[in-house]
Amino acid sequence: MASISYLLAPLVLAAVLQPTAGAPLDAPTESPAGETSGEEAETGSPDDALAVALESVLGATKLHKNEFLVEFQGEVKYDFLDRYKIPSLPAKCPYSNFGKDACLRRLLEGLLIYSVLLKRVEEEFPSSSILSEVRFYSNILIKELENKVRDRDQVMRLTSSQEEQLLKDTDYPDTFHRKMTAHGILYNLHYFLVDCRRVINKRAKHRESAGSRVVRAVTFYHPKKRS
């Protein structure tokens, strides 16, 4: 895979994600350039380290599309990977009837599965700088999620035998299928993150809207006294 230069160097992000106690972090003001309308970041995302880490992973995974198109010289369309079936992929966050904490838990459990699947990608592309960045930012995001979710001890984690089975299920004898599986893992990881971000941001906007209605109601029932 071709080398890349990403906006946030690993050491810079590591410093950013270790702020002084009480000092809030500024989340990215805009999503990485070039996202399609289905991937656009929605306003209202939480302004904290988790949001920064999530955007950083997405910035790394999004670079995969151009690299895929260059590798296949346009002969294979990128959305072909959407139809390429990979077993045991984690479920995405439903857009409705799903709370923020439930989505954060789904995101965490999904990332733990993808962290195993990325071993398959590493076997095919051992020198990939994209993969290195995806792993780095994913590990930061996992730590942030572990600090956010409730009852983290109840988070489902794969056993060693389950990890072995997962890698076995994605192992193919021919080179083409192994390579397409590796590409498919990065493709599905990106859109898994996109969908989770959309749900998280929706819940954040819903809370902001509810808080605004409460403030208006209090103001209405308790008008300022005339001097």
Curated annotation (Swiss-Prot):
* Region described as Disordered: spans on this chain: 24-45
Q: What induces it?
A: By LPS and PBS.
Which cysteine pairs make disulfide bonds? 93-103
Q: Which InterPro entries match?
A: 4_helix_cytokine-like_core (IPR009079), IL-6-like (IPR003574), IL6/GCSF/MGF_CS (IPR030473)
Q: Name the tissues where it is expressed.
A: After induction, highly expressed in spleen. Can also be expressed in kidney after incubation with PHA.
Keywords associated with the record: Acute phase, Cytokine, Disulfide bond, Growth factor, Secreted, Signal
UniProt record similarity statement: Belongs to the IL-6 superfamily.
| Gene name of the encoded protein | il6
Signal peptide (UniProt feature, chain positions): 1-22
Q: What is this protein called?
A: Interleukin-6
